[in-house]
């Protein structure tokens, strides 16, 4: 709450959508979903994270040990906080990042590691004796001396049961998974991991030389950071440049583009394992459709073009809801048309914080303050 104006500044909301804003979503659509049993709506193209933010949901989880409130911190696979459980029964799947979960009609998601609710968690009492709960405290605190007829290990076994109930995040299903899974083998000259500017350019260059190329990206849409960029590439807006290049790659029979595909392991002899989320963006897979597919990719060479992850500035309370990465906040504004709050303060030590503030202000977000730890900020950045 802003003490001066009385406005709620921490809760997100959907901006007035217009051309150039909300590039990833269908402005005229509506998708119904539930979070912790409450009904909400979003747009086609939303992630669960962007839809929750648009509906003003600020607390989405609780921390592992102290059960401190957690909000959405990022916009991609680096998200540490917004872990949810989806589906029910035998299809229950815990620890899914809300930032990667594509919204679909009828989605049912639940927060984790809280009781009875994420907004009122009884286990938050753990914050009171927090200093006594140092890392590994249970390995010494409950190891009492042996007594006749009562061994120390027996006392630990008793305490261990209680600790295990309090530990962990989501709970998995106990029944057999009813979904189907597939496997594919692929052989190529060049594997490109990541479809930003570097990845697309590498795929283009290799394909133009006659090489067989596989281009993988973990997101639903290729383009990486360019999809929310306001910069120009070859005289065109970055997202238009991406669309043009992907259209050209699609015409080349030697190029395979795999979206929703995470390259997660590298083995000997240039062999890579990738997991494609074939039907995780729908409520249930089709009758003969696999839910996920494992790709064993053998290549002659690989280009790792996965980009960079913004590092947060460390300060007391930076784990609280309402604190998030600046570039991620910009992504929510530009790609999903969602403001992270009624008013924003940008805390930065480099130029990208100023550029994020510029883009957010351009689309109607109130940027109250920019705090830069540097003594000298380039005039060109201030002017931007």
Question: Where do the PLM segments sit?
Answer:
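Residues forming the flavin
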Residues: 2-384
């Amino acid at each position: 709450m802003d003490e001066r104006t009385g406005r709620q500044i921490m809760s997100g909301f959907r901006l007035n959508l217009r051309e150039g804003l909300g590039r990833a979503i269908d402005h005229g659509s509506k998708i119904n979903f539930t979070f912790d049993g409450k009904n909400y709506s979003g747009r086609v193209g939303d992630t669960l994270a962007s839809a929750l933010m648009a509906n003003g949901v600020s607390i989405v989880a609780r921390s592992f040990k102290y059960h401190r409130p957690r909000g959405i911190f990022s916009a991609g696979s680096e998200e540490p906080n917004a872990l949810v459980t989806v589906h029910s029964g035998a299809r229950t799947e815990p620890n899914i990042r809300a930032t990667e979960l594509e919204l679909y009609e009828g989605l049912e998601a639940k927060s984790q590691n809280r009781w009875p609710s994420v907004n009122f968690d009884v286990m938050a009492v753990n914050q009171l004796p927090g200093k006594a709960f140092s890392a590994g405290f249970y390995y010494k605190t409950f190891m009492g001396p042996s007594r006749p007829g009562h061994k120390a290990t027996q006392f630990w076994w008793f305490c261990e049961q209680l600790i295990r109930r309090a530990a962990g995040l989501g709970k998995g299903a106990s029944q057999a998974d009813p979904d189907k899974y597939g496997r594919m083998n692929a052989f190529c000259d060049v594997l490109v991991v990541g479809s930003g500017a570097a990845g697309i350019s590498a795929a283009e260059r290799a394909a133009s030389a006659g090489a067989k190329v596989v281009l993988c990206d973990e997101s639903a849409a290729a383009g990486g950071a360019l999809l929310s960029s306001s910069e120009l590439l070859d005289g065109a807006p970055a997202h238009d440049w991406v669309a043009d290049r992907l259209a050209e790659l699609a015409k080349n029979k030697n190029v395979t583009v795999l979206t929703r595909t995470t390259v997660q392991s590298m083995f000997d002899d240039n062999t890579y394992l990738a997991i494609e989320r074939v039907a995780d963006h729908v409520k249930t897979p089709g009758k003969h459709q696999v839910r996920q597919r494992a790709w064993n990719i053998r290549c002659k060479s690989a280009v790792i073009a996965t980009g960079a992850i913004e590092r947060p500035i460390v300060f007391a309370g930076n784990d609280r809801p309402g604190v998030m990465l600046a570039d991620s906040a910009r992504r929510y504004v530009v790609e999903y048309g969602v403001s992270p709050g009624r008013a924003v303060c940008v805390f930065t030590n480099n130029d990208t914080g100023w550029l994020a503030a510029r883009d957010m202000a351009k689309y109607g977000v109130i940027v109250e303050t920019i705090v830069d730890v540097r003594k000298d900020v380039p005039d060109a950045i201030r002017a931007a």
